[in-house]
């Protein structure tokens, strides 16, 4: 019922706040320059968003929507990088995007890839592997902000 929905929303908010806090700590420690995130970006995002994040990738002209640039996310958010929104957008498994949208649902793709490769074994679940890739990618996006 309503209480269950509220708990789910509260859980999502708490998870996003926790992730955002982890990102702030990682960014402050210099992890934002991690090459793993850059590699992930070049493989998963540059085709549409461009190698420099300006929204001018080789596939951008083939899409029926305008591909946004990613270098001014902080500037367009009052100088603060919108951690939770970026993570949720990349992940795509929460909310309306899970039912289809202009971006791939990377969280599901990453989790399936971890499961298929056998990389998610022991204490690392496919979901944890997916979130790690999303966090690396988010840290890279922080590093390219103007």
Task: Please report, for each region that a protein language model flagged, where it lies by residue.
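Axial heme c-ligation environment in periplasmic c-type cytochrome domains
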Residues: 61, 68, 90-132
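Electrostatic cytochrome c docking/interface patches
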Residues: 25-41, 71-79
């Amino acid at each position: 019922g309503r209480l269950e929905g509220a708990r789910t929303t509260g859980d999502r908010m708490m998870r996003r706040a926790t992730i955002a806090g982890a990102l702030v700590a990682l960014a402050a420690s210099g992890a934002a320059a991690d090459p793993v995130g850059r590699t992930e970006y070049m493989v998963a995002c540059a085709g549409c968003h461009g190698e420099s994040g300006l929204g001018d990738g080789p596939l951008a002209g083939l899409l029926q929507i305008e591909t946004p640039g990613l270098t001014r996310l902080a500037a367009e958010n009052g100088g603060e990088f919108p951690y939770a929104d970026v993570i949720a957008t990349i992940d795509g498994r929460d909310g309306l995007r899970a039912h289809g949208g202009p971006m791939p649902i990377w969280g599901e793709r990453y989790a399936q890839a971890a499961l298929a490769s056998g990389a998610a074994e022991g204490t690392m679940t496919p979901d944890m592997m997916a979130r790690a890739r999303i966090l690396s990618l988010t840290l890279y996006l922080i590093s390219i902000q103007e």
